[in-house]
């Protein structure tokens, strides 16, 4: 009885739940909020994400497992850290530290909510909006399952070819994508496998989407296509809401026999070739 009364006693939710994820955990104070260890770790790790080196430690950083935390450090400070594993991001050089190399699409130009103001021209004219793009590859699952089956009576349907195919897709969306974004005012939130999610000034998001699609057609020799949705939002719109609504535009593009783009509304859905020309 006493346990039930204790669990159901009154009080603010922040006294019992993390104010960010609402999990019931042991809470700590961070920036005037009561948060769990995971959310505090995400707060701190978000400041370290720009570093090129990431290490696994036992008790400092973002918790990722039993006695394992992920922490971002600068290369010159590696010698000051006690770690069990090192990861290097987007770097081909072997260097002097034994590390696992990982590649991610992580181009970043400005803070996300600055992009709306950057959409205006040099005279301060134009609509103050940011844009979000979500896109993915059409029928990629079918390509993996049956892409080689019609050639040579299926003799090319091998694990090695599927692995090469997968590696080539990852190379495009994790490495080359940063080059397509490098001169544009946008941030890549996620890029990997066959999905892309990016936020930026609306002019540059459109240009980025078109450039990405054109290069993808070249990369796949015209055998695969993309479908994309681009949403237009005020700068105070929550990212979760922008992602959801843009995902609906992406689905509208796929519903247009794919290889299409939905621009700002499902009413404006076009085949990519028609949109570009």
Regions found by a protein language model. Give the residues of each.
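Regulatory and interdomain segments flanking nucleotide-handling catalytic cores
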Residues: 1-277
């Amino acid at each position: 009885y006493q346990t039930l009364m204790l669990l159901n006693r009154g009080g603010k939710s922040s006294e019992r739940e993390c104010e960010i994820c609402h999990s019931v955990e042991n809470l700590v104070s961070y920036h005037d909020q009561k948060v769990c260890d995971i959310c505090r770790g995400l707060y701190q790790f978000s400041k370290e994400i720009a570093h090129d080196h990431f290490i696994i430690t036992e008790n400092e950083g973002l918790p990722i497992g039993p006695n394992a935390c992920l922490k971002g450090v600068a290369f010159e400070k590696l010698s000051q850290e006690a770690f069990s594993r090192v990861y290097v991001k987007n770097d081909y050089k072997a260097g002097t530290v034994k590390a696992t190399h990982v590649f991610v699409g992580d181009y970043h130009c400005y803070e996300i909510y600055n992009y709306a103001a950057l959409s205006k021209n040099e005279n301060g004219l134009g609509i103050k909006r940011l844009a979000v793009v979500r896109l993915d590859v059409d029928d990629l699952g079918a390509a993996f399952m049956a892409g080689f089956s019609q050639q040579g009576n299926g003799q090319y349907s091998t694990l090695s070819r599927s692995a090469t195919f997968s590696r080539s897709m990852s190379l495009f969306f994790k490495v080359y994508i940063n080059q397509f974004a490098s001169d544009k005012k946008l941030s890549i939130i996620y890029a990997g496998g066959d999905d892309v999610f990016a936020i930026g000034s609306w002019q540059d998001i459109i240009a980025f989407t078109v450039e990405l699609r054109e290069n993808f057609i070249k990369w796949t020799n015209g055998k695969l296509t993309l479908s994309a949705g681009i949403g237009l939002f005020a700068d105070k719109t929550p990212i979760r809401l922008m992602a959801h609504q843009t995902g609906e535009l992406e689905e509208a593009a796929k519903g247009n026999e794919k290889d299409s783009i939905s621009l700002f509304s499902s009413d404006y859905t076009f085949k990519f070739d028609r949109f570009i020309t």
